């Protein structure tokens, strides 16, 4: 693997970084030496690259950025579906096999239900006071109860139907205006990534703040400067949460921000707070002054929650932090899945034809597709499910932390072990999927069985499973399927005139398409169906 040359070249390129690492390593050497020796004797761990003394495999990780791609390449070279990578004093266990994944999240779920405390999640959760990013404990239990019982319950899901419909209608209005507007690149050219991401952002703002815009209302239904800045900040946080920062494994280096992750996340969080906090503060004042008496959105719901003593259940800090986390969780899967799926379907036009035929048969062309139509849209849902399988948003799920020494299969994992389930490799494992790299929605269709976007057997990860499963399955499923259904029912899609097919190549740093998908849209329905006056 050329370990020594990579290590030496990295030392030459970043000598001051490695000097600090070495200094810190020797500081902790006396404390950790005996512990590490005993640990290696006591625990039986999966195969992995031979670690360097003290720093483990940190040199390889730093020499092969991004680490997510390096880990997958390493496991392929080792021909293993579970590995052990030592990053300083942290044991990281990546998993690419659904059967092994179920051992962790189903059979031994109680032992692996926590989260590691690292720099990025500390910042994104404002000190671990939210839900998804928070270690197992009383704070997590409190905030999860709030989500499950008060924000994402079936009753609240139905209560918010009208707001979701408004944003689905606005999506149609926005794309229709793009079709009718003469632009430099010609009428109808749509950036699918922008449209899909801002649909998610609009749904978030409408459900939480009962408004589509932070700033000026845009006449075409599209995003303004404020909405663009907000959604970009959201995806920046997503990018750097669990991005294998060196300070996560050598905490002494956190404030030095050697890889720049800390400053990027903090800047994105400042942008989020810039838009959220004034609205939240003003809304609380309205309730306190008696100017508001009726709950209209989820912010109102959070403000009015009371504890057993009739005091506010959430502190202001908890409320604000949880709203930021909701923004992060609501925008990721739908937009990326749709962009990839539509690109795949353009290259396989028979799939696009079948999806639109199903929509026409179920809905017709005299009205817009609604959430009540979703149970009948089996092929459309199969397209969404296949996109989540083949084209996940991230390489790995949120890490699971081992809370006590646990035996899984033939291995004994020590407390503090981090387990990473590979969203990419689970969904593309050839032992579980025939022709796994082919986009084939048909594989999910079975007579008499409803197509769902969840996958409890972890053959791919959409909403995960176990104690740390996503409580927003209904909302996430609805947003994803409605994005697919409205865009496919309302418009016909084709490549620009100078493009014969879509290049299905991911970015070198993440799992987005390397180039945003640009397609020509043409309305399929009567003009009056695209009009909306809602803001």
Curated annotation (Swiss-Prot):
Q: Which residues lie on this side of the membrane: Lumenal?
A: 30-535
Which positions bind heme?
Answer: 470
- Identify the keywords attached in UniProt to this record, alphabetized: Endoplasmic reticulum, Glycoprotein, Heme, Iron, Membrane, Metal-binding, Microsome, Monooxygenase, Oxidoreductase, Signal-anchor, Transmembrane, Transmembrane helix
The main place the protein resides is membrane
Tissue distribution:
Exclusively expressed in aerial parts. Highest expression in the apical leaves. Also detected in the second leaf from the top and in the stem. Not expressed in older leaves or roots.
Instruction: Please give the InterPro entries that the UniProt record associates with this protein.
Output: Cyt_P450, Cyt_P450_E_grp-I, Cyt_P450_sf
What chemistry does it catalyse, as a reaction equation? L-isoleucine + 2 reduced [NADPH--hemoprotein reductase] + 2 O2 = (1E,2S)-2-methylbutanal oxime + 2 oxidized [NADPH--hemoprotein reductase] + CO2 + 3 H2O + 2 H(+); L-isoleucine + reduced [NADPH--hemoprotein reductase] + O2 = N-hydroxy-L-isoleucine + oxidized [NADPH--hemoprotein reductase] + H2O + 2 H(+); N-hydroxy-L-isoleucine + reduced [NADPH--hemoprotein reductase] + O2 = N,N-dihydroxy-L-isoleucine + oxidized [NADPH--hemoprotein reductase] + H2O + H(+); L-valine + 2 reduced [NADPH--hemoprotein reductase] + 2 O2 = (E)-2-methylpropanal oxime + 2 oxidized [NADPH--hemoprotein reductase] + CO2 + 3 H2O + 2 H(+)
Q: Which residues lie on this side of the membrane: Cytoplasmic?
A: 1-8
User: Does the record's keyword annotation contain Metal-binding?
Assistant: yes
Q: Give the record's GO CC terms.
A: endoplasmic reticulum; membrane
Family of this protein: Belongs to the cytochrome P450 family.
Which protein, by its recorded name, is this?
Answer: Isoleucine N-monooxygenase 1
């Amino acid at each position: 693997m050329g370990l020594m040359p990579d290590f030496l070249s990295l030392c030459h390129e970043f000598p001051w970084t490695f000097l600090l690492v070495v200094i810190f390593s020797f500081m902790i050497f006396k404390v950790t030496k005996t512990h590490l020796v005993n640990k290696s004797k006591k625990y039986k761990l999966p195969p992995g690259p031979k670690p360097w003394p003290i720093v483990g495999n940190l040199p390889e990780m730093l020499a092969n950025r991004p680490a997510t791609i390096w880990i997958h390449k390493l496991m392929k070279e080792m021909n293993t579906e579970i590995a052990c990578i030592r990053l300083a004093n942290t044991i990281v266990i990546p998993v690419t096999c659904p059967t092994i994944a179920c051992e962790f999240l189903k059979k031994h779920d109680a032992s692996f239900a926590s989260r590691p405390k690292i720099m990025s999640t500390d910042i994104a959760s404002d000190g671990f006071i939210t839900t998804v990013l928070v270690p197992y404990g009383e704070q997590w239990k409190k905030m999860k109860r709030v989500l499950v019982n008060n924000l994402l319950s079936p009753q609240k899901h139905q209560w918010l139907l009208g707001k979701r419909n408004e944003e689905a209608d606005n999506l149609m209005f926005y794309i229709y205006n793009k079709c009718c507007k003469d632009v430099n690149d010609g009428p109808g050219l749509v950036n699918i990534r922008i449209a899909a991401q801002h649909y998610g952002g609009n749904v978030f703002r409408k459900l939480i703040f009962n408004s589509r815009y932070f700033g000026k209302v845009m006449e075409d239904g599209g995003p303004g400067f404020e909405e663009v800045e907000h959604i970009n900040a959201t995806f920046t946080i997503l990018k750097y949460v669990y991005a294998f920062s060196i300070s996560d494994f050598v905490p002494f280096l956190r404030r030095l921000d050697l890889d720049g992750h800390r400053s990027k996340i903090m800047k994105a969080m400042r942008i989020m707070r810039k838009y959220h906090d004034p609205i939240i503060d003003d809304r609380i004042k309205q309730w306190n002054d008696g100017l508001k008496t009726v709950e209209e959105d989820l912010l109102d719901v959070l403000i009015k929650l009371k504890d057993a003593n009739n005091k506010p259940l959430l502190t202001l800090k908890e409320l604000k932090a949880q709203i930021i986390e909701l923004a992060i969780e609501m925008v990721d899967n739908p937009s990326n899945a749709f962009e990839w799926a539509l690109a795949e379907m353009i290259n396989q036009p028979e799939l696009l034809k079948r999806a639109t035929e199903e929509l026409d048969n179920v809905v017709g062309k005299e009205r817009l597709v609604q959430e009540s139509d979703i149970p009948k849209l089996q092929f459309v849902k199969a397209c969404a499910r296949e996109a989540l399988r083949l084209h996940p948003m991230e390489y790995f799920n949120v890490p699971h932390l081992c809370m006590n020494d646990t035996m899984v299969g033939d291995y004994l994992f020590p407390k503090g072990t981090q387990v990473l389930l590979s969203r990419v490799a689970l969904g593309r494992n050839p032992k579980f999927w025939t022709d796994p790299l082919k986009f084939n929605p048909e594989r999910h269709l079975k007579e008499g069985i409803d197509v769902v976007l969840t996958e409890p057997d972890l053959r791919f990860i959409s909403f995960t499973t176990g104690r740390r499963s996503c409580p927003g399955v209904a909302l996430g499923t609805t947003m994803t399927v409605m994005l697919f259904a409205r865009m496919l029912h309302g418009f016909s899609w084709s490549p620009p005139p100078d493009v014969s097919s879509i290049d299905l190549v991911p970015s070198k740093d993440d799992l987005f398409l390397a180039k945003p998908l640009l397609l020509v849209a043409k309305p399929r329905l009567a003009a009056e169906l695209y009009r909306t006056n809602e803001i």
